[in-house]
Amino acid sequence: MSEERELLRETVAALVEKHASPEAVRAAMESELGYDPNLWRLLCEQVGAAALVIPEEFGGAGGELADAAVVLEELGKALVPTPLLGTTLAEIALLSVGRTEPLEELAEGAKIGTVVFNPEFVINGDIADIMIAADGETLTQWDTFTAQPKPTMDMTRRLASVIPGATTTLGDDQGLADTAALLMAAEQIGAASRCLDLTVAYSKDRVQFGRPIGSFQALKHRMADLYVKVASARAVVHDSIATPSSTSAALARYFASEALSAVTSEAVQIHGGIAITWEHDIQLYFKRAHGSAQLLGPPREQLRRLEAEVF
């Protein structure tokens, strides 16, 4: 990771630590907007989070996809609900067809964007100002639309069912779903990493039979296996983002989804019954794991895509 990108990561991590405590995350996810507008403003003003993938001539930071991935990975660690994923994808879609008019307001965070892959489950669909539909062949802007929030298992990710009204065809879809898969994989890796950290910390504090449960060899082995799984998945995701393609996107999503699901499942087992209580954060990571795995195609679908490359 470059020095500039590491500085970006540290800046986001500091903001998250200060403004996105578990209590703040819960308050944000239960709010009318589904995110904390003050934190969103700080991310846009101090980090330029919504401007990272936009060229400087259009009011952006002139960064790369990997920069946005770094921010999403840090936000994923604390399950911070923000409009960043959808807004970034909308910006990439608009840039791919040369439609630059909305970019300045998106970069400032004044407007929220999102992308429709499945109209029944649109990220931040009920709060978006700019909505782009991608069907694998064509990008279409939904100039008017009706959105209905959907009840979700993962309350940290706002989803809505959206029906289009007036639409405008923008141009060819150059693989926006693959870009979305890469960014979501980065977010998943962040969540997996933090969930594992929380589990290790708990195993050191929880005493049973007169000693911390983390000192028992069976649990040591399980957590060591999880560490390898997360580290391996992170390497795959980072390499995939550096060399994006349809194949690398499927790889990233498969490994990230499997890693997060494995970590959260073991976290529930190691924590015991407390993990599934509303007051404990592990249940939020468990729900994020299974909710995210179903968006943009579940792991088995990614595996089928990879198999098609071989057979």
Curated annotation (Swiss-Prot):
Binds 2 FAD per heterotetramer. It holds the Pfam family Acyl-CoA_dh_1. GO terms for molecular function: acyl-CoA dehydrogenase activity; flavin adenine dinucleotide binding. It comes from the Bacteria. SUPFAM superfamilies: Acyl-CoA dehydrogenase C-terminal domain-like, Acyl-CoA dehydrogenase NM domain-like. InterPro entries: AcylCo_DH-like_C, AcylCo_DH/oxidase_C, AcylCoA_DH/ox_N, AcylCoA_DH/ox_N_sf, AcylCoA_DH/oxidase_NM_dom_sf. FAD binds at R206, G273. Pathway: Steroid metabolism; cholesterol degradation. It catalyses: 3-[(3aS,4S,5R,7aS)-5-hydroxy-7a-methyl-1-oxo-octahydro-1H-inden-4-yl]propanoyl-CoA + A = (2E)-3-[(3aS,4S,5R,7aS)-5-hydroxy-7a-methyl-1-oxo-octahydro-1H-inden-4-yl]prop-2-enoyl-CoA + AH2. GO terms for biological process: cholesterol catabolic process. Disruption phenotype: Deletion mutant grows normally on glycerol but shows impaired growth on cholesterol. It accumulates 5OH-HIP in the culture supernatant. Its cofactor is FAD. Keywords: Cholesterol metabolism, FAD, Flavoprotein, Lipid metabolism, Oxidoreductase, Steroid metabolism, Sterol metabolism. Its EC number is 1.3.99.-. Belongs to the acyl-CoA dehydrogenase family. Heterotetramer composed of 2 IpdE1 subunits and 2 IpdE2 subunits. Involved in cholesterol degradation. Catalyzes the dehydrogenation of 5OH-HIP-CoA to 5OH-HIPE-CoA. This is Acyl-CoA dehydrogenase IpdE2. It comes from Mycolicibacterium smegmatis (strain ATCC 700084 / mc(2)155) (Mycobacterium smegmatis). The lineage of its organism: Bacteria, Bacillati, Actinomycetota, Actinomycetes, Mycobacteriales.
